[in-house]
């Protein structure tokens, strides 16, 4: 009989995309996969499109919100727990996988109430509130970065589940010896990167640099106009659909330090200048960036000290030192966990009794 797995993942791509990677491995192993999410998160669009049944919870995050939201939190969480309880009783899963974020809280708690094996996976180097709490009651605790949880949690480091296209970098290595710069302003647009990076690139001089810049929809026109004002040729897009191709094309990335970005850079062996989002909860992006920087795979530049002059100096230093780029690429690949999705799926199936 096929094992039944419920996945708890929602809100942002940082939770949803690694969960989809695991879901694909589970489905290929013959398991039935169901999803629990919200109607307002990314999962509402991409999970049904991937062919997975999804059930809805009425819940949202409360950290960083105002007093009014926090006052409503107990009632909201109570309702979400009741919804999760009904869903789990109807779906009858053999195991539940929580991928962090507010969606995982009610479903994870109700899984334990019903005696269903609970596995959690943390994508960041600093665990989020939900996973810190669930780690005390979960049957298995998995982490993307070694040491994310305290030793008492008994966590196993699996790495972050990668999209199938990113996994293919395991089988080929692209030499990073050119002058191709990939700028990732994020799906929502990172103002600091979109406004400072073009000006820094305009200061480089010397050999020409090929530029690709993902701006996010909100800042696309402004950034494109800025490149034109600076007389710089650049391929500017609101979104880059084929990230595998972009990673393979680039010799250097300039970007934020979300968990999946850091993991994909490592898998692609792509050297990077990382500018962590300074307002991320618990400053987890700085911790993520440190993981690559400490290994010599990236340069960390705090946004508080970022300006076009210092950034231009760093970009020039990297592009002019081909040996250093290659060393950074090798260091990144040494950190990669190409089998993370398979490892997480295997734990789920073990707990499900497969």
Curated annotation (Swiss-Prot):
It holds the Pfam family Glyco_transf_28. Its EC number is 2.4.1.227. It is a peripheral membrane protein. GO terms for cellular component: plasma membrane. GO terms for biological process: carbohydrate metabolic process; cell division; cell wall organization; lipid glycosylation; peptidoglycan biosynthetic process; regulation of cell shape. It is found in: Cell inner membrane. Belongs to the glycosyltransferase 28 family. MurG subfamily. HAMAP family: MurG (MF_00033). This is UDP-N-acetylglucosamine--N-acetylmuramyl-(pentapeptide) pyrophosphoryl-undecaprenol N-acetylglucosamine transferase. The lineage of its organism: Bacteria, Pseudomonadati, Pseudomonadota, Gammaproteobacteria, Methylococcales. The gene is murG.
């Amino acid at each position: 009989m096929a094992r039944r797995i419920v996945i708890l993942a929602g809100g942002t791509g940082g939770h949803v995309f690694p969960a989809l990677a695991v879901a694909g491995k589970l489905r290929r192993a013959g398991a039935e996969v169901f999803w629990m999410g919200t109607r307002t998160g990314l999962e509402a669009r991409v999970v049904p499109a991937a062919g997975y049944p999804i059930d809805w919870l009425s819940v949202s995050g409360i950290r960083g919100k105002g007093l009014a939201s926090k006052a409503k939190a107990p009632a909201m969480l109570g309702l979400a727990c009741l919804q999760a309880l009904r869903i789990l009783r109807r779906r009858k899963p053999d195991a539940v996988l929580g991928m962090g974020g507010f969606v995982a809280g009610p479903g994870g708690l109700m899984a334990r109430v019903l005696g269903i094996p609970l596995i959690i996976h943390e994508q960041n180097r600093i665990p989020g509130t939900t996973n810190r709490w669930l780690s005390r009651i979960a049957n298995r605790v998995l982490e993307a970065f070694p040491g994310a949880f305290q030793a008492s949690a008994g966590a196993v480091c699996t790495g972050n589940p990668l999209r199938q296209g990113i996994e293919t970098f395991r089988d080929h290595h692209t030499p990073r010896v050119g002058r191709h710069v990939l700028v990732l302003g994020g799906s929502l647009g990172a103002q600091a990167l979109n406004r400072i990076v073009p000006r820094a690139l305009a200061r480089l001089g010397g050999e020409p640099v090929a530029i690709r810049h993902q701006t996010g929809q909100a800042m696309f026109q402004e950034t494109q106009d800025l490149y034109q004002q600076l007389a710089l040729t650049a391929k500017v897009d609101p979104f880059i659909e084929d990230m595998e191709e972009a990673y393979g094309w680039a010799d250097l990335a300039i970007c934020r330090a979300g968990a999946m970005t850091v993991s994909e850079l490592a898998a692609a062996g792509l050297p990077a200048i990382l500018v962590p989002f300074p307002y991320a909860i618990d400053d987890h992006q700085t911790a993520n960036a440190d993981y690559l920087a400490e290994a010599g795979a990236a340069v960390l530049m705090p946004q508080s000290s970022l300006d076009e002059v210092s950034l231009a100096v760093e970009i020039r230093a990297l592009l002019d030192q081909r040996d250093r780029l290659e060393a950074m690429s090798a260091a990144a690949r040494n950190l990669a966990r190409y089998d993370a999705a398979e490892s997480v799926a295997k734990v789920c199936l073990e707990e499900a009794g497969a």
